[in-house]
């Protein structure tokens, strides 16, 4: 029953690539959508590299072990992991620094991170989310939303609101959890 008959109205906004059909059933508007799993082999490959890079991080009680891969539109890649060159650097920051040191223009690039990019920091002036927005990345792909252990992360939400395409592949999250078993 619709709201006019004492029923509830449920609103679902399908993704742009979903195939949907609309019909009326017993006086109700019904939308049926076919959703396809998001399994780009390219995304999974780069994300697996990021997860592997996260395993190179020295475990710390004050931070997650994260890996990141910057992929430029021309196909060049730059990989980093948490604490690679400094005890305060995050993986995204390390990979971005390497790309900038190589003279790369990051506008339109993608970044693959084993964990959701941080949205606030106490050890650096800019969060990874701010760095991603500042440098004009068009896509962010990660495996695991950042747990609320240290801060309440809003990275994915902030990036989406700014128009950045955000993809999450939880099928690779197990490797991220393993790399961060020291925080369990």
Report each predicted region and the residues it spans.
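A short, polar/charged loop-to-alpha-helix boundary motif
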Residues: 86-97
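Short, flexible loop/turn motifs enriched in small residues
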Residues: 59-65
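Short helix-loop-beta connector
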Residues: 105-109
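Zinc-dependent deaminase
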Residues: 1, 10-12, 20, 24-59, ...
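A short, conserved beta-strand element enriched in hydrophobic/aromatic residues
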Residues: 77-83
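Local cysteine-cluster metal-coordination motifs and their immediate loop/turn environment
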Residues: 89, 113-130
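Short beta-strand scaffold segments in enzyme catalytic cores
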Residues: 65-72
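Compositionally biased, low-complexity flexible segments
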Residues: 5-7
């Amino acid at each position: 029953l619709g709201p006019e008959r004492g029923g509830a109205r449920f609103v679902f906004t399908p993704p742009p690539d979903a195939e949907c059909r609309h019909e009326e059933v017993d006086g109700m508007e019904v939308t049926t959508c076919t959703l396809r799993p998001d399994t780009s082999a390219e995304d999974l490959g780069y994300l697996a590299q990021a997860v592997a890079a996260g395993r190179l991080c020295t475990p710390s009680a004050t931070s997650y072990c994260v890996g990141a891969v910057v992929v430029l539109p021309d196909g060049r890649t730059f990989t980093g992991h948490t604490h690679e060159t400094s005890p305060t650097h995050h993986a995204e920051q390390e990979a971005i620094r390497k790309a900038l040191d190589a003279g790369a223009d990051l506008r339109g690039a993608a970044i693959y991170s084993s964990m959701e990019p941080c949205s606030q920091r106490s050890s650096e002036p800019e969060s990874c989310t701010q760095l991603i927005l500042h440098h004009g990345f068009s896509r962010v792909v990660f495996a695991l939303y950042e747990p609320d252990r240290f801060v309440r992360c809003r990275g994915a939400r902030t990036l989406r609101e700014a128009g950045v395409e955000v993809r999450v592949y939880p099928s690779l999250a197990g490797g991220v959890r393993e790399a961060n078993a020291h925080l369990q």
